Structures are given as C-alpha cells and as structure tokens.
Amino acid sequence: MLKPLGDRVVLKVQKEEEQSIGGIVIASNAKEKPTTGEVIAVGNGRILDNGQRVEPEVKVGQSVVFDKYAGSEVKYEGEEYLVIRENDIIAVID
C-alpha cells in the first residue's frame, strides 16, 4: 500500500460520468478534472518550523473535495491514485 510522507494524502479519485444527462457522450478533453475523492492513506502530518508536528485533519475513508490542479497522479498495482498535500483539500463531504 502507498504510505504518504509528511502532510500528503493519497486519494482514490471519483471519476465523472462519461455521458451527460441527455445521453450525449462527452469527449475526454472536454470533461472537467474530477475534484472529489476518497482518502485512502494519510501521512504523519506537517512539521512546523519549531519542530512540532501538526496532526492531519482528514482520516482514511472520508470523502473530500480538493483543488482541481492539486497533486500528482500515481499508478500503483494497476490502480490510479492522486497524492496531494492536505492543505489542497478544501472540504470534507458528510
């Protein structure tokens, strides 16, 4: 399993539908980049300048909204993930 370092978070991105409500197929270059995902793994937290560690606010299993230009795409064991910094997460979905 991927284990993120520091304040990084591994997400399984929730893919968008490939068809519109009217049944029209949307070209891949016309689709918006997904901005929601499920937290798969969380690092140990950010370290401040004074050496203190700030615990992550998100937890494994939570669904989150993140900045659409955030992170790095990673392929691991045939699955695609997104590794982002915790501060690129905008909200937790209840």
UniProtKB/Swiss-Prot annotation:
Q: Which is one Gene Ontology cellular component term of this protein?
A: cytoplasm
Kindly give the NCBIfam families that the UniProt entry links to this protein: PRK00364.1-2, PRK00364.2-2, PRK00364.2-4, PRK00364.2-5
**Taxonomic superkingdom:** Bacteria
Q: Which UniProt keywords apply?
A: Chaperone, Cytoplasm
Q: Which HAMAP family match?
A: CH10
Where's it found, cell-wise?
Answer: Cytoplasm
Tell me the subunit arrangement. Heptamer of 7 subunits arranged in a ring. Interacts with the chaperonin GroEL.
Q: Which family does it belong to?
A: Belongs to the GroES chaperonin family.
According to its UniProt entry, the function of this protein is described as: Together with the chaperonin GroEL, plays an essential role in assisting protein folding. The GroEL-GroES system forms a nano-cage that allows encapsulation of the non-native substrate proteins and provides a physical environment optimized to promote and accelerate protein folding. GroES binds to the apical surface of the GroEL ring, thereby capping the opening of the GroEL channel.
Alphabetized GO MF terms: ATP binding; metal ion binding; protein folding chaperone; protein-folding chaperone binding; unfolded protein binding
User: Which InterPro entries does this one have?
Assistant: Chaperonin_GroES, Chaperonin_GroES_sf, Chaprnonin_Cpn10_CS, GroES-like_sf
| Chief place where the protein resides | cytoplasm
Supply the Pfam families for this chain. Cpn10
Is Protein biosynthesis one of the keywords UniProt gives this record? no
Please give the biological process terms from Gene Ontology that the record holds.
Answer: chaperone cofactor-dependent protein refolding
Q: What is this protein called?
A: Co-chaperonin GroES
